């Protein structure tokens, strides 16, 4: 499991990528990402998530994204990523 906070953009997306790669190397089950403190994500950050999902799918896993703020959830909806990732409502 991983929690995202603040902003994920071109400047800090590599840090997110390395965290996710660490989880992916374990090749165990699904990855859950809590976004309750995430305030912003750009296309670079979305690209990192998509790349991670491709790796997870290689071993029949999935990525669940939880607690997206409404305006970030809208980005996932507009880009169609809400159909690719498992999105859980805030709660």
Where are these regions (language model features)?
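STAS-like cytosolic regulatory interaction modules
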Residues: 1-39, 51-91
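Short, glycine-rich nucleotide/cofactor-binding loops
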Residues: 42
């Amino acid at each position: 499991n991983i929690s995202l906070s603040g902003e994920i953009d071109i400047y800090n997306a590599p840090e997110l990528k390395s965290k996710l790669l660490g989880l992916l190397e374990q090749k165990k089950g699904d990855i859950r990402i809590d976004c309750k403190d995430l305030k912003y994500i750009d296309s670079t950050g979305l690209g990192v998530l998509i790349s991670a999902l491709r790796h997870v799918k290689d071993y029949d896993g999935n990525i669940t994204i939880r607690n997206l703020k409404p305006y970030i959830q809208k980005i996932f909806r507009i880009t169609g990523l809400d159909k690719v990732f498992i999105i859980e409502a805030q709660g």
